Amino acid sequence: MDITNRQAVLKNFLGNSPDWYKLAIMGFLIINPLVFFFVSPFVAGWMLVIEFIFTLAMALKCYPLQPGGLLAIQAVAIGMTSPHQVAEEIANNLEVLLLLVFMVAGIYFMKQLLLFVFTKLLLNIRSKTILSLAFCLASAFLSAFLDALTVIAVVISVSVGFYTIYHNVTSNHSDKDITDDSGIDNQDSHETLEQFRAFLRSLMMHAGVGTALGGVMTMVGEPQNLIIAKSAGWNFADFFIRMLPVTLPVFICGLLVCLLVEKFKLFGYGAQLPERVRQVLTEYDQQASAKRTKQEKMKLIVQAIIGVWLVLALALHLAEVGLVGLSVIILATSFCGITNEHSLGKAFQEALPFTALLTVFFAVVAVIIEQSLFTPIIQFVLQASPSAQLSLFYLFNGLLSSVSDNVFVGTVYINEARSAFEHGIVSLQQFELLAVAINTGTNLPSVATPNGQAAFLFLLTSALAPLIRLSYGRMVYMALPYTLVMTIVGLLGVEFLLVPMTEWLTQAGWISLPHITNGVAIPH
């Protein structure tokens, strides 16, 4: 059936997104200029922020780059902010963009080593409780130094690989489509497959939460951490130590939750790896190990050495994070024999869409700054006592981060806190405590929904999710015990431990106060 030009344009607009979503975005684009010119720029600015958060919350309907980008382009076009202000925001956060471009691509070339590690963990640890703890710890450690998306991508690769192997064997190799269970006609095999799915679901959730537990601890664990660290003038060690009063109790309690939900089979956890599946996977791994050539073994050794360089370079702050990532790309590709341009290009595919989206974030942040949108909220919070300010910043960040992207939320709040410090509203010591509250508030409660954690959203939209029956609702349900414990322990840490522990660490000489010159914080 022929369609009109108008219908063709509507079908092309935002692709396969639902019609109601397309109409909503078009409505935003029509209403925003009218409100800006005829009602109030302040109201129009807040409408833009809410609309942008809406596009982030609806990420499963349409990747936020397109609708959010259209809103940002219009905001610049009608004068909500200027191209110069947007360029300034991007320049201020160039380190973060380099982190995403080079570090994520660098870790892509270390995937063989990471796959090897997680495969050995899964097959060699027979206790499900210990295995869950190992996955959580491994994900936390890796996410403290690497990109959380890459870590979760590796765990997804392991899980999809194992699922494919077992599915093909149990369907007698007759069913090449692993999404189709019709080739499995045995009831026992169906039950075993369901148990295997439950087993993989729980492991993926433990790994996902592990990325949050480790990611909050270091300045490279999450993109917003680097923005916060730069604003406060902290290096890698400073950031890690300053976060410890909150992150260490949360980390310990997070691991306890991991043990308890597995031991008592709560919230969908506790499923064991079926023995039949273990036999199939072990046989496959033994065959793969036997076929591994000396060249492939040397690649694993080289990648392990590069991993040590990565940790040392970050811990000792030998170079900017993005440049360390670039060095990983050069070393890994040189010594693993990857010299084809097409092969190099694949490494950048994962990070560039999010890098583009982050640039759109900065355009919206420019609007927030230009229109002073958060000034009333910040003034309200800063009227409270210093200790109450910390809890309020933590809670406001946590609430927004659980429904929106935590990079966006963290960027907005650290900019406002920095502005309050520069205008003499808060002291330097209080600003640094607020930076800790903002970082932990942005990272910890955001595990509540896939919208808050990029790693969770990546898992939900991956090829693995439908295979193991991991829906949005099930993900929220399985994350609930972690959400409650991490949020509450984090709040208690901010309220009762942060100030006395920071004072003790300062007196002990573990941390020093930076001085600020020309608007940039520089550590002593």
UniProtKB/Swiss-Prot annotation:
Protein's recorded name: Na(+)/H(+) antiporter NhaB
Species assigned in the record: Yersinia pseudotuberculosis serotype O:3 (strain YPIII)
Catalytic activity: 2 Na(+)(in) + 3 H(+)(out) = 2 Na(+)(out) + 3 H(+)(in)
Recorded GO CC terms: plasma membrane
Alphabetized HAMAP family for the sequence: NhaB
Function summary: Na(+)/H(+) antiporter that extrudes sodium in exchange for external protons.
Membrane-protein topology: Multi-pass membrane protein
Gene: nhaB
GO molecular function, one term: sodium:proton antiporter activity
